[in-house]
Amino acid sequence: VRKLVLVLGAVALVAAACGKPSPKVYSDARTRACLQAQGVRLAPPPASDFVASTALGGSFRALLHRNFVTISFGSSVANATSLDHVYRTVHARNVGIDDVLRTQGNAVMLWHAHPSDTDLALLHGCLKT
């Protein structure tokens, strides 16, 4: 019986340790550095983007081959969720917001146009903690 209790206790500990991982909190500075190392030009977000201007973790625009993306970092995942919500609330009616707005961890990405798989892979590969 003792062995069974020990085995069940060990299984419970392993199961608890293997739970769902928490969302990542990405770094503005490390993400910028990675994108620049990949040859991506960076710029400040447009002055008209008041959502990006309120991002507590920073924001910038990445100018890719045929597209660009404004990346806004929340100070936390909850803060990024708020940024995402505001973008969805204020978007123009003729914009398919679900097609151009993506959130991963604390990073909110607003694309100018539907992103290509190549651009998505580059950006996601450069999101750094």
PLM regions: where:
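Positively charged n-region of N-terminal signal peptides that target proteins for export
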Residues: V1-L4
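C-terminal motif of bacterial Sec signal peptides marking the signal peptidase cleavage site
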Residues: V14-A17
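Bacterial signal peptide processing site
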Residues: G19-P21
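Short secondary-structure junctions
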Residues: Q36-V51, H91, K128-T129
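Secretory pathway targeting signatures of secreted, lumenal, and periplasmic proteins
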Residues: P46-F68
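An anionic, turn-rich surface loop/hairpin at beta-sheet edges
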Residues: F50-S53, T81-D99
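A short acidic-to-branched-hydrophobic micro-motif
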Residues: A62-T81, A107
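A short, solvent-exposed beta-edge/loop patch
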Residues: H91-T129
